[in-house]
Amino acid sequence: MHTEHTRDRTERLLADLVRIDSTNPALGGDGHGAGEREIAAYVADVMHDIGLDVDHWEPAPGRPNVVGILPGAGDGRSLMWNAHMDTVGVEGMDAPFEPTRKHGRLYGRGAQDMKGSLAAQLVAAQNLKASDVPLAGDLLVAAVADEEHKSIGTEALVDRYDVDGAIVTEPTDLQLVRAHKGFVWIDVQTHGRAAHGSRPAEGIDANMHMGRVLSRLEELGRSLSGRQGHALVGPPSLHAGQLRGGSAPSVYAAECRLRMERRTVPGESAEEVLAEVRGILDELSDADEAFEAEAEIAFAREPLDTPADAPIAAATRKGLAHVLDDEPAPDTGASFWTDAALLAEAGTDTVVLGPEGAGLHTTDEWVDLDSVAHLAEVLAHTARRYCVEQAS
């Protein structure tokens, strides 16, 4: 159970955070998102007031990270809590930065994704700082930029800090997530020959050729859904995200471009996924000498797969059981991607745990206020269990 004092502080802090426009510049429409400067300054002030050592820097111009450090009293494990400060855009929302409380929920842009989590991290750090029992290992409270676009914040974070364990506090309905999918964006281009629509003997239609590719990708998608998949995240998937081809109705298309997304599961690599797509193109080319196409990776992120017996997973389970006064739900997986994968790639045992809510990336976003307070208590209890002296 959370204390009313924790509930009051997380609610007030969350409301303050929602009032600050931190729309990602890449997602605010015409590149006009406010970015993280104002919210980072606010978070840094809160960290200073708590008594943390504050590291405030910009991985890219105008895109700050803030890390508050509670130094450990010994040689215990180091722990990081990670939340992003940026949000998606606000199109269609009437008052996105006016926090509204209703039926135990707080509504507003970023309430669930993920300012509720950021508020919980700060209150948990405050509780630990005020405790008479210091942690044996360092605690790092990270507020990062740009998760909603290219994750430059956490990429810079893992270059700057090396920690033993991490909890990324993306919303999970207070369920422990230790695996999630990755993704690969692949650009496919088919080539044709431009000609007037009245001269079919001279034209080669790149759009029609892309149609063959799409048909084969649809078959592949059905095959992927039938695979056994990963125990926590299920099977992989794919979809055709963006398609562009041709210059005019009366002209044979000289080229057609597809950007597809392939959701990967632990054990799959981006290179394997690319080879799968290139294999389709090779088969189509073998069947028709006029067919010409290529595929390249545009962007990729790895999946997350933290072992069940990792110390950070065990400590988080204990924290959940203590705060909720019940055995936690079984560990689960997620179909979405988070910055946890970047921390794991850097060698940090990482899990994902966040509050309850709904409507992220929609016009009706909310977070459950009790769950935010619960998260703060779970984080603090987990830190006490995790940041202990390591066996020699």
How would you describe each model-predicted region?
Residues M114-W185, C387, A391-S392:
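Acidic/histidine-rich catalytic neighborhood of metal-dependent amide-processing enzymes
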